[in-house]
Amino acid sequence: MKLFEDKSVEFHKRLSKKERSDGGVFFTPKDIRDIVFEELGDFEPTNILEPTCGTGEFISDCRKVYKNSRIIGVEIDPRSAELARDGSKNEIIVHDFMTWDTDEKFDLIIGNPPYFTRPTGFKHDPSVVKCRSNICIEVLHKCITRHLADNGMLAMVLPVSILNSKFYTPTIDLITDTMDVVSARAIKKNNFMGTNVRVMVFIIRKRTPGFVSKYTFKTSLGKVIINPDGERLGSIVSGKKTIGSLNVNISFGVTLASVKEYFVDKSCSGSFPLICYNNIAKKGDLLFVSDKYSKKRFNGRAILIPRGYAHGDYSFNFIDYTNDYFIIENHVIAITGEDCVLDIIAKSFADHRTREFCRLLCSSGDISKDYVKEIPVFG
């Protein structure tokens, strides 16, 4: 299978690494584009919008699949736009999609929006993100609220990590409150040029009566979570209490850089351990810190789990740890509370279903405090 058109490969080669990174320019391979159309099924749109069309890979596919549809592409880079026009066969508008406007509503909005964080000082819209805005989320939100027809479908290739970022909850909540999640199909391996970010095929439409998505589940607190394995997660958590229902504190730790100057030998008087990710995941040797370091100290008992990293698979593990004093690094999460509650948690965490639940829930490779609260308690 030819993954990219020649024009895209040549254009990609001409871009510097900085241009690709700053602009989030990573073209979608054919095998993933095919999955998008597979998930759309027999949907027949009258008009189609690709909001950040690049060199027009999706537009070329749409022209073959939807022969009678009107297709519009919007692209900020005139060089990409010229390639997307393909000898004037396609209607391509050179414009920043975020400031582009039209009264037309579209039956299908399709594409792979760029993914990059806005620079420091950018004034974010609190109805879109909490902070640290990302162009990908802005494009998604604008498509939903300004351009999607009432009976339309939005089909995009998006990073799986957007689903559990606390920064993007305003837009994710908009989706769970007003939209049907038709697909959130995770792509385990991909052939993107220049990036290995984990992605999903994400398809939504405006809420329809009686629709039940296999890509969402409702927590014990009533929150709806979107996940590629939503159906299985819902069955695991059904009827169970969760960590969030127990009287515990959930804490992150400190960065290694902030504590590095306080490292000492464990024989040093008053020193105490720093528990790192590897001490839980790989049972590595402990580091020790001088008693001159006083921030975020724990004393007594805690259940410690790896926070993980935003890539790869999340692998759950835990240690039931007790010491007079200790601190944890920021890739570790501490759960503290009364011994009787920690006994319940330790027993539950030893259950194989906890490992499965966390692996499926943490599809982006790491776990948040909010997700820790959703871990079911097994008796």
From Swiss-Prot:
A Pfam family this chain is assigned to: N6_Mtase
Catalysed reactions, as listed in the record: a 2'-deoxyadenosine in DNA + S-adenosyl-L-methionine = an N(6)-methyl-2'-deoxyadenosine in DNA + S-adenosyl-L-homocysteine + H(+)
MF term (GO), any: N-methyltransferase activity
Class of the enzyme per the UniProt entry, highest EC level: transferase
Family annotation (SUPFAM superfamilies): S-adenosyl-L-methionine-dependent methyltransferases
EC number(s) stated in the UniProt entry for this protein: 2.1.1.72
GO process annotations (BP): DNA restriction-modification system; methylation
Similarity section: Belongs to the N(4)/N(6)-methyltransferase family.
Protein name per the record: Type II methyltransferase M.CvrRI
Organism: Paramecium bursaria Chlorella virus XZ-6E (PBCV-XZ-6E)
Gene it is expressed from: CVIRIM
